[in-house]
Amino acid sequence: MSCPYAGSGNDHDDAAVPLSTEVGKIYGEYLMLDKLLDAQCMLSKEDKRPVHDEHLFIITHQAYELWFKQIIFEFDSIRDMLDAEVIDETKTLEIVKRLNRVVLILKLLVDQVPILETMTPLDFMDFRKYLAPASGFQSLQFRLIENKLGVLTEQRVRYNQKYSDVFGGDEDALTAIRSSEQEPSLLELVQRWLERTPGLEESGFNFWEKFQQSVDKFLEAQVHSAMEEPVERAKNYRLMDIEKRREVYRSIFDPAVHDALVRRGDRRFSHRALQGAIMITFYRDEPRFSQPHQLLTLLMDIDSLITKWRYNHVIMVQRMIGSQQLGTGGSSGYQYLRSTLSDRYKVFLDLFNLSTFLIPREAIPPLDESIRKKLINKSV
């Protein structure tokens, strides 16, 4: 029996069959490759002293900027979807999909650093003089990513100048910076979304009150267990540890303590938003909280990967120019970059610290029938 999908052998045409008769752009025109592939201007070559690795340096940083543009594109669309009173399940799924895309892009950017490291410090020195006053500190798109994500101006490390000063008289860049500082960041929008978590209502399930009761019971059970410790020194140690844990929980149960931590920069979320994040974490196996939990996990992944990228960048800079030299843009180079690895630049710091407030699974307040019905019918 002949293959039902095979032709007769007489109707084969070597000429390519166009998918459409409409006039369109060919591959190179659509991607504007004439401009893209002609944008690598090696200053060492113009100086009649071409340095081979300058080409790699340019290509790598241009690739970074292209991916930065895509990240901004994704962040803007995600912020648009989050900027609503109610976010239905289909939108949450799309937000999760796009956040995951950003995560994969950032993984690619982290893995791109070792390619630059194939260049030796001596190779870099051959063309470094041509870079001044250019500097990665002047990457407008990376600053926009930070602002759109939620890095606050007061949280930034200042070295000699405000971060936006490097853009000098570039009014378009300064306008973009100001706009990104004023519009709602991803952090602010996620905070609003968490504040609406169903189950937090005092007139309803009132998760927060039930959680406090569960924590009190959990700690009292630990005290009771510690009191049965036959060795006095071990008993006192356990009791001291329990008191420390009680103080940790007080930092989330007492709104005044929480607000003080926010003002100090040790917390980011509002008290209500933190409650929502804890509730989603505890009940992540519930169908309605499955996607929100994925969303929170992806936000932590983004923070982690940006930190990893910063770290790889720091190590590469130290390897290329050491820890004492100034950067090409006049910043303190290695010292400045190392300072950006602190929690000051971690936007979703509170999500990383949620594990501090966990209690054993058996101590988690059970959902009653009314909240289960509400979760079935309510968008988060």
From Swiss-Prot:
<dbReference type="GO" id="GO:0019442">
    <property type="term" value="P:L-tryptophan catabolic process to acetyl-CoA"/>
</dbReference>
<keyword id="KW-0823">Tryptophan catabolism</keyword>
<dbReference type="GO" id="GO:0020037">
    <property type="term" value="F:heme binding"/>
</dbReference>
<keyword id="KW-0349">Heme</keyword>
<feature type="binding site">
    <location>
        <position position="128"/>
    </location>
    <ligand>
        <name>substrate</name>
    </ligand>
</feature>
<feature type="binding site">
    <location>
        <position position="328"/>
    </location>
    <ligand>
        <name>substrate</name>
    </ligand>
</feature>
<protein>
    <recommendedName>
        <fullName>Tryptophan 2,3-dioxygenase</fullName>
        <ecNumber>1.13.11.11</ecNumber>
    </recommendedName>
</protein>
<keyword id="KW-0479">Metal-binding</keyword>
<dbReference type="GO" id="GO:0019441">
    <property type="term" value="P:L-tryptophan catabolic process to kynurenine"/>
</dbReference>
<comment type="similarity">
    <text>Belongs to the tryptophan 2,3-dioxygenase family.</text>
</comment>
<dbReference type="GO" id="GO:0006727">
    <property type="term" value="P:ommochrome biosynthetic process"/>
</dbReference>
<keyword id="KW-0408">Iron</keyword>
<comment type="pathway">
    <text>Amino-acid degradation; L-tryptophan degradation via kynurenine pathway; L-kynurenine from L-tryptophan: step 1/2.</text>
</comment>
<keyword id="KW-0560">Oxidoreductase</keyword>
<dbReference type="InterPro" id="IPR004981">
    <property type="entry name" value="Trp_2_3_dOase"/>
</dbReference>
<dbReference type="GO" id="GO:0046872">
    <property type="term" value="F:metal ion binding"/>
</dbReference>
<dbReference type="GO" id="GO:0051289">
    <property type="term" value="P:protein homotetramerization"/>
</dbReference>
<dbReference type="InterPro" id="IPR037217">
    <property type="entry name" value="Trp/Indoleamine_2_3_dOase-like"/>
</dbReference>
<comment type="function">
    <text>Heme-dependent dioxygenase that catalyzes the oxidative cleavage of the L-tryptophan (L-Trp) pyrrole ring and converts L-tryptophan to N-formyl-L-kynurenine. Catalyzes the oxidative cleavage of the indole moiety.</text>
</comment>
<comment type="pathway">
    <text>Pigment biosynthesis; ommochrome biosynthesis.</text>
</comment>
<comment type="subunit">
    <text>Homotetramer. Dimer of dimers.</text>
</comment>
<feature type="binding site">
    <location>
        <begin position="57"/>
        <end position="61"/>
    </location>
    <ligand>
        <name>substrate</name>
    </ligand>
</feature>
<dbReference type="Pfam" id="PF03301">
    <property type="entry name" value="Trp_dioxygenase"/>
</dbReference>
<feature type="binding site" description="axial binding residue">
    <location>
        <position position="313"/>
    </location>
    <ligand>
        <name>heme</name>
    </ligand>
</feature>
<dbReference type="GO" id="GO:0004833">
    <property type="term" value="F:tryptophan 2,3-dioxygenase activity"/>
</dbReference>
<keyword id="KW-0223">Dioxygenase</keyword>
